[in-house]
Amino acid sequence: MIIGIDDTDSNEGMCTTYLGALLLEELQEYGTVETLPLLVRLNPTIPYKTRGNAAIALKLKTDCPEKIIAHVTSRIEEFARMECEKTNPGAVFIQEKDYRSLKPILLSFLEKAVKDVIEIETAKHLISELGISSKSFKNGRGLIGALAACGAMLNPEKWDCTFEHLAYRQKKKWGSPRDVNKDSFFEADRQTYPGTWDTVDLANRLVVCVPHSADPVLFGIRGESPELVSKAASLIRSEPVERFAVYRTNQGTDMHLLPAASISEIRDMHSYRFEGTVSAVPKTIEGGHVIFAVRDGKGDEIDCAAFEPTKNFRVLARRLLLGDQIFLSGSVTSGTLNIEKMQVKELVLLYREENPKCPECGKHMKSAGQGQGFRCKKCGTRASSKIRCEAERDLEPGLYEVPPCARRHLAKPLARERDQNIRIHPSR
């Protein structure tokens, strides 16, 4: 049986992955766990998400599916933050006999849930049409993520994956400040990067894998393999860990990005990668955000933003000039692209004027007075005007990214970039 669950958390607390870790232990009474649990991030632009818009899936071999359904339902009722308006839990249960027939259908649903917008009624209709067992609470929006997570579990070979070691706090500690040794995270990063990433932000001296909300998560280490994330986790010094789980995830894969041949294709609440030319110089607006415009070959434009949380990435954005050719990726809300990565493909030439050099001694001439040109004091040679010469740009071609402290869950870090033909500038 495959179990998909979503939307049990709220902005104030709880975490669906905690429920997954708990069930992973408890459900062994009714069967055998067949593989790692899944953590599936969905479309990051959805406005009614709680926090990270993540769903989970578990896979077990069992002879008593009804007991599993009853147990999962009971635990959702106990742990879900039902008082929160945005919390609308959903659970889906796929029987083993249906794996083959549902595999392509739910793969398509997964891809749409990550890249597009799905209405609750669409999920409910599909569940009814396919005869899938499910449980929902309140408006049942969690059924969308639950179905998508089941699609991921049915199709593990169809999507790029990473892993996350999630450590959870003792329940009595929930809501209190986390007691962690900051230096141990930097040491874990030193020993395991680039096999792990987003543990810390070196440039901004921040630990980024420790949440600040009142949820049960103590920390989460992301990386390329279960072994690497667990090695990094073993180096962390902190308050006691109640339990932990290693999830297979679609985090750090760029799974959310759609290719856009032209800016006219771009819509709000979707994420894209596209190419264009800087058509309005970067400007810093109130709040410290940096905004500039990009135009495509058809003349369509879109505003692009390096928002204040992207910190040092804004310095790079400010160095762009009119005419620079760039390739961007990010999510669109309110008609503006929130930049996740930027590939500088071609830079326009920058020129400056300087005093001419003496052809005899090679030194720069001095002004001979207003309207009198330039003269070398040593040699007496003259020139009528300044000369125009190429200036060095303070930006190099290559691929850049926002810092770890600003990276979205699905954005692929440059630590994972395998294209040898692109010069990368990882943000550390």
From Swiss-Prot:
Q: Alphabetically list the UniProt keywords.
A: ATP-binding, Cytoplasm, Ligase, Nucleotide-binding, tRNA processing
Query: Which enzyme type, at the first EC level?
Result: ligase
Q: What is its EC number?
A: 6.3.4.22
Reactions listed under catalytic activity:
cytidine(34) in tRNA(Ile2) + agmatine + ATP + H2O = 2-agmatinylcytidine(34) in tRNA(Ile2) + AMP + 2 phosphate + 2 H(+)
**Per its UniProt record, what Pfam families does this chain match?**
TiaS_FLD, TiaS_TCKD, Zn_ribbon_TiaS
GO MF term (any one): ATP binding
List the GO cellular component terms: cytoplasm
Top-rank lineage group of the source organism: Archaea
Q: What's a BP term from Gene Ontology annotated to this protein?
A: tRNA wobble cytosine modification
Where does the UniProt entry say this protein principally localizes? cytoplasm
Name its cellular compartments: Cytoplasm
* Family indicated by similarity: Belongs to the TiaS family.
| Function field | ATP-dependent agmatine transferase that catalyzes the formation of 2-agmatinylcytidine (agm2C) at the wobble position (C34) of tRNA(Ile2), converting the codon specificity from AUG to AUA.
Question: Can you say what this protein is called?
Answer: tRNA(Ile2) 2-agmatinylcytidine synthetase TiaS
Tell me which species this is from. Methanosarcina acetivorans (strain ATCC 35395 / DSM 2834 / JCM 12185 / C2A)
List the gene name.
Answer: tiaS
